[in-house]
Amino acid sequence: MPIDMNALGAETPWTQVTVTQRQIDSLCSCLEDYNPLFLDEEISQQSSNGGVVAPPTFINCFRDFKTTLVLSETEVDLPLLLHGEQVIHYYKPVRPGDTIWHKIKVVDAGRKKSKTYGELNFFTVLIKLKNDADEKLVEATQLFFVRDK
């Protein structure tokens, strides 16, 4: 299924979410990552972080938001979607109590050759997270391939 090339440049509005310790606890439980820097205020206060921080993979909690943009704008069938690559640049830690603003944009689309699947459609999204002070927290790109039916 070809990607709707009109999706190139499509983006979501800035949307906010407040990070809670409960969200961080849930993610750590799912990952079976019990690092005290993510879970224990007393221990994490003694670290260079100066308090509890969210695990780096916390940004993936915004996946539903991303999927909505991708599926509606690119007109891709979810079962045909393959994760290609992900590059994440971290600028500041995400902490419980932070209000995070996030935005996603389709920045590239086209066709590429794959060793396994032959020629595939692809698209890349840019994910931006910032805090209430307009400080950049995270920028990430994710490449997705779309198998032909």
Residue ranges and their predicted role:
Residues M1-E85:
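Hot-dog-fold acyl-thioester-processing enzymes
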Residues N60-C61, H89, L143-F145:
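Residues in well-ordered beta-strands of folded domains
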Residues M1-M5, P93-K149:
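HotDog/MaoC-like acyl-thioester-processing domains
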Residues L81-Y90, V107-A109:
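Short acidic (Asp/Glu) patches
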